[in-house]
Design a protein with these regions (language model features):
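Alpha/beta-hydrolase active-site loop
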Residues: 109-132
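Short alpha-helix in the alpha/beta-hydrolase fold that links the catalytic acid
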Residues: 218, 232-242
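Short beta-strand/loop motif that positions the catalytic acidic residue
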Residues: 216, 222-224, 228
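The serine-hydrolase catalytic nucleophile loop
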Residues: 66-77, 92, 234
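N-terminal cap/lid segment of alpha/beta-hydrolase-fold proteins
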Residues: 23-52
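Conserved alpha/beta-hydrolase
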Residues: 80-101
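Catalytic active-site module of serine/aspartate enzymes centered on a nucleophile-bearing elbow/loop
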Residues: 256-279
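Hydrolase active-site cap/lid region
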Residues: 153, 157-196
Length: 279
């Protein structure tokens, strides 16, 4: 994950209860509003509410890689509020109007940086639970790409989140994902070759999400592209399959024609049905 990811995929419409208004959501955010995270960091946010009196189910939106801001979640905000969801979106720490320092993620610093990003996402959940407009018992986490590492950590830190929805999110260690991405951009073209080369990798692994996924009791749904050249989809599914055998409520949908960017129309209905089970 070497670049910021576009958010055209973000037309996700999760219908899991609450009012289903036809009109756009309304902002509930004072100018310059922030909420606190760890280490004195304050995160600039927007909280978008559907029409109606609430309390509303809510989603905390997690970032992909890069210097992303709350404005890059506008599409998901519009879709979610139309279906009765509140959406909390915020500038990544060290980006936009949020304080703190921005860092990219690598094998050496990954555990620390991803932990900080998870602290921020969990702080968003805690913030929502202080708001009278929000049903604190119906909060879910959603994200793309890098959020595949962040969301399981955030779910550990935020008890009672109802579900996780991850689009193109890896379950492999950071070092392995970076190595795969480098190979895919280089001379290794076939997925059999890529998988074989991954098995030979002897470099630093860095942060590994698997132990955290093993310890969670939060249902999760992954949408994955078979042609993804950013994350190793085969290995991600292998890990999810193994975790399912130990009783974890993890499932996935593999889209054969697509890579890292899966058109929203391909998965929105399934995502909505999944979230509808957590009223």
């Amino acid at each position: 994950m070497k670049r910021a990811l576009p958010f055209a995929w973000m037309g996700l419409a999760l219908a899991c209860g609450g009012t289903s208004p036809a009109g756009p959501g309304t902002a509930s955010t004072p100018q310059g509003a922030t909420f606190p995270s760890t280490d004195g960091v304050r995160l600039s946010y927007a909280l978008d509410l559907p029409p109606g009196s609430g309390p509303f189910p809510a989603i905390v939106f997690g970032h992909g890689s890069g210097r992303t801001t709350k404005d890059e979640a506008m599409v998901v905000k519009s879709a979610m509020t139309r279906l009765g969801f509140a959406v909390l979106r915020y500038d990544k720490r060290g980006v936009g109007a949020s304080t703190g320092s921005y860092e990219g993620v690598g094998p050496i610093n990954g555990a620390r940086v991803l932990g900080e990003l998870a602290d921020d996402m969990a702080a968003g959940v805690a913030f929502l639970r202080t708001r009278p407009e929000i049903d604190g018992h119906r909060i879910g986490l959603m994200g793309i790409s890098q959020a595949g590492w962040v969301i399981p950590l955030a779910a550990e830190r935020a008890p009672d989140v109802r579900y996780m929805i991850l689009v193109s999110g890896p379950t492999v260690p950071v070092g392995l994902e970076i190595y795969y991405s480098d190979l895919a951009e280089g001379t290794a073209t076939g997925y059999d070759e890529l998988s074989a080369r991954l098995r030979e990798y002897q470099g630093p692994l860095g942060f590994d999400p698997r132990p955290h996924l093993e310890g969670l009791n939060v249902p999760g749904l992954w949408f994955l592209g078979a042609q993804d050249r950013s994350i190793p989809t085969r290995e991600t599914i292998t890990i999810l399959s193994e975790l399912r055998t130990t009783g974890h409520a993890y499932r996935w949908h593999l889209f054969d024609p697509y890579g890292h960017f899966i058109p929203q129309d391909e998965y929105v209905s399934e995502a909505a049905a999944f979230a509808a089970g957590f009223r």
